[in-house]
Structures are given as C-alpha cells and as structure tokens.
Design a protein with these regions (language model features):
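Active-site helix/loop of acyl-thioester processing domains in fatty-acid/polyketide metabolism
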Residues: 49-69
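Acidic, divalent-cation-chelating loop motifs in proteins
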Residues: 38-40
Length: 163
C-alpha cells in the first residue's frame, strides 16, 4: 500500500504487516498520540477531542492529494461520532480516513479510530465537508483533476467512493 507523508502524523512507507487489518481499506492513516490534558472527569478521552483528531486526519488526507495548501476554503456541514470503547491515557490512535462519497462541491469523509493498546476500533465518525470559493460564500466544484487524484488514491486500497 502506498502512503503519502504531508505532516509528521501521517504514516508513510510502512509495510502492510504494520497496518491493522481493520484499516486496510483506508488510504491515509493519521497517527495521534493522546495527551493527558484531553481526558475528561472519568479519565476517558473527552468526546470533543475525537472531532479535533478527525479534523487533523482530514487535512492530512487533503494535503496528501495536493488539495489543501492553506488557501482551500471548506466548511463542516455535518458530523457524527460513534464511541465504541473508552480510550485512556497513555495511548496512541491510528485514524483511518477515506472518502465515502464525493459530490459536486462536497465530500463525505469516513473515519475509523484504531487503538494501538486495545488493538481494536474504538470509534467511527463521518463528516460532510463543503468546498467554497475563496470569498467563503459560493460553493466551488471539485475539478476533474482533483476528482481523478482522489479516486486514484482510494483505488490503491480497493475502495471506490460513491458519487
């Protein structure tokens, strides 16, 4: 599996044996260490932190495609997260991220949070992102070249996003 390195937290060039089977169909993986200050009163990873991690993974995905240079304007239209198992400090999560559906001006991102300590998926999430013109008002369609790069990346792990 080919991997892209755009930020320090994206895994790259690792052998398939290092990839948890649960994340084999995710073209990008974001490595996220848990920080002590992210715990809640019950010593679990606070629920809001999962959304921050998804944002970091999403930006890494777009950077890997050469689509996020800091000038791309996107807004979060919808998001959800299903918490399957508690996560506690110390821990490292691997976030698999992929495109579930690519619309004309939107992208539905899918995430799986894999615990290296528990060796299991501990949460899943989804986010609908809408791309805007630089003025932040008008929707901006994905170009043909961007769509082709995205589908080529997903195809490398045997995943085909819906359109």
């Amino acid at each position: 599996m080919e991997h892209f390195e755009q930020t320090a937290n994206l895994t790259s060039d690792r052998p398939d044996s290092d990839c948890p089977k649960e994340l084999a169909h995710y073209p990008i993986m974001h490595r996220q260490p848990i920080h002590w200050g992210e715990m809640d009163a019950f010593n679990h990873l606070n629920n809001v932190v999962y959304y921050r991690y998804a944002e970091s993974a999403r930006i890494g995905y777009l950077q890997a495609l050469g689509m996020f240079d800091g000038n791309m304007v996107t807004v979060l239209a919808q998001s959800s997260c299903q918490y399957l198992r508690p996560v506690t400090y110390p821990e490292t999560l691997l976030l698999g991220v992929r495109c579930q559906r690519l619309g004309t001006t939107s992208i539905v991102m899918e995430y799986s949070y894999y615990s290296t300590a528990q060796q299991a998926i501990v949460a899943t999430a989804e986010a609908v992102i809408v791309r805007l013109e630089s003025n932040g008002k008008d929707k901006l369609p994905w170009t043909k070249a961007e769509r082709e790069r995205l589908f080529a990346l997903e195809e490398k792990v045997g995943h085909v996003p819906k359109t």
